[in-house]
Amino acid sequence: MNTMTLTPGQLSLSQLYDVWRHPVQLRLDASAIDGINASVACVNDIVAEGRTAYGINTGFGLLAQTRIADEDLQNLQRSLVLSHAAGVGDPLDDAMVRLIMVLKINSLARGFSGIRLSVIEALIALVNAGVYPLIPAKGSVGASGDLAPLAHLSLTLLGEGKARWQGEWLPAQTALKKAGLEPVALAAKEGLALLNGTQASTAFALRGLFEAQELFASAVVCGALTTEAVLGSRRPFDARIHAARGQQGQIDVARLFRHLLTDTSAIAESHHHCHKVQDPYSLRCQPQVMGACLTQLRQTKEVLLAEANAVSDNPLVFADAGEVISGGNFHAEPVAMAADNLALAIAEIGALSERRIALMMDKHMSQLPPFLVKNGGVNSGFMIAQVTAAALASENKALAHPHSVDSLPTSANQEDHVSMAPAAGRRLWEMAANTRGIIAVEWLAACQGIDLREGLTSSPLLEQARQTLRERVAHYTQDRFFAPDIECATALLAQGALQRLVPDFM
């Protein structure tokens, strides 16, 4: 199990990926403690002095003008958590819940939230014990923060709701007891600090980014395989072409293709003096299209990494000045827009892959047997596999519709513009699954195409990609049940079988 020392505000993308992929033992760096304690002292001073401050001794949302008596402050925070735990839909899996929890801890430990160290440590204890609150997938509009998901997370701290422990759903009180933990009672400001924030939206989009990175790398490998399978030219990847345009993503993608294809191969030599002048766009323009996608991935990474380390609470406690200031850091518009742009990239990666599959089906374009199988007519080969890829690509076009342009006012128009970031991030998962299915079909098709070149081989890395598939999926000599092969190739992609062939590109 990974051990991680959390220095608030300094999480890296690789650390976030590890948190998503694996259970973690978390430890808070001691440098955070003074800031946490100072913010709590500031909140305590406000209460003691009888000053009015939003979220500390007032109601919430449209009820912000309602002053709460000191004796009701603890009940106020508990009531907030209970009432806001109103999510619906399937529970998030343990990996997603773990990522949300670590993001929440990272934000709270920055020392701007007025939440006690003991509560932050209780959250850390949940992560370390593998107690995962039941968080429904739906119910947040991404402003004022991810209220419903984070309320469900916070329920477990109070011993309410349900949680998973060692793979079993249990009443939260029972899960805590089995893990040797105790519920906590919240003090002034703490319920709001737990609920306000963009951590669910950010976690949703981060998963989309992690999957998009794998898809991008896999698609570049499969694009190179297809280039070889249909006797495509290496010339469009010449560095001089891309330097002349100056788009960095395009330059870097062309470099990846040169790395994978190398200068030549037995296949390339076999058509060195062919009559073709230019390849179709789906081959020739791969650096331009995939380069644009890479640029979106990089920009999304920049936004999400900043948000993962951000303080997205409200109000914020500035202990050095003794002030509590209301703002709008809970508004997840940066995450929503980043997720929308990432959706375009995921859709285009799949769309270009589908076009390359279609190219291989056409004997006039590919110079291969129709649908990549001998004895056509008796055998249908990849005919319907390409239809499946087309169906998935079409679904992604609809799913790529932007969410950040939508808004519905909530809380009696007090919260009159929202981001829809959770939905923007969550749909990326379905899009990624669709695109992975498309790339799986291309991998199968491209390897079949190279097989049909009768003993000619590609570059060492591309031959490794072909061998990886052939260890699990045999060459098609005649029709057979196709779906298990797509499923197998899809699983290999998800495990990073092709991604590991590509140098770091982010």
From Swiss-Prot:
Catalytic activity: L-histidine = trans-urocanate + NH4(+)
Listed GO biological process terms: L-histidine catabolic process to glutamate and formamide; L-histidine catabolic process to glutamate and formate
Record's GO cellular component terms: cytoplasm
Keywords: Cytoplasm, Histidine metabolism, Lyase
Pfam families in the cross-refs: Lyase_aromatic
Enzyme class, broadest EC rank: lyase
Main location per the UniProt record: cytoplasm
Post-translational modification: Contains an active site 4-methylidene-imidazol-5-one (MIO), which is formed autocatalytically by cyclization and dehydration of residues Ala-Ser-Gly.
Protein EC: 4.3.1.3
Keyword set includes Cytoplasm: yes
GO molecular function annotations of the record: histidine ammonia-lyase activity
InterPro entries xrefs: Aromatic_Lyase, Fumarase/histidase_N, HutH, L-Aspartase-like, Phe/His_NH3-lyase_AS
Record PROSITE patterns: PAL_HISTIDASE
Keyword rRNA processing appears in the UniProt entry: no
Pathway per the UniProt entry: Amino-acid degradation; L-histidine degradation into L-glutamate; N-formimidoyl-L-glutamate from L-histidine: step 1/3
Gene3D superfamilies: Fumarase/aspartase (Central domain) (1.20.200.10), Fumarase/aspartase (N-terminal domain) (1.10.275.10)
Location(s) in or outside the cell: Cytoplasm
Tree of life domain: Bacteria
List of residues that carry 2,3-didehydroalanine (Ser): S144
Residue location of crosslink 5-imidazolinone (Ala-Gly): A143-G145
Family named by the database record: Belongs to the PAL/histidase family.
Protein name, entry field: Histidine ammonia-lyase
Source organism per UniProt: Salmonella newport (strain SL254)
Gene of this entry: hutH
